[in-house]
Amino acid sequence: MAIDVSFEMENKIGEVKEELASRIPNILEAIGIEAEGNAVSEITEMEAVDTGRLRASISHAVDGDAVYIGTNVEYGPYVELGTSKMEARPFLHNAVANYVDDYKAIMEADLKR
């Protein structure tokens, strides 16, 4: 008794790549929003708030496959990096470095949908 077995394979790699590429901007936007909140928390915890202007100025921008977080306040770099007379209070660095697992979780949650 002969058994005929046949199957057909279809390559969907291109579609999968397109789907993943289409999700990247939304993932980066979600990470940017989270990073903004984390930077605000870092500034507040460091007691680096006088008028609240720096804290209110924190924003993010998605550009291609990257997200940037920063401030347009002229004294932001001095707070972040310090000066010869003022100790650094790296709120932006900490907002990225201290929350890597949170950002990974955002990516994973989106990709599991």
Feature-to-residue mapping (PLM):
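Short, Lys/Arg-rich flexible segments
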Residues: 1-113
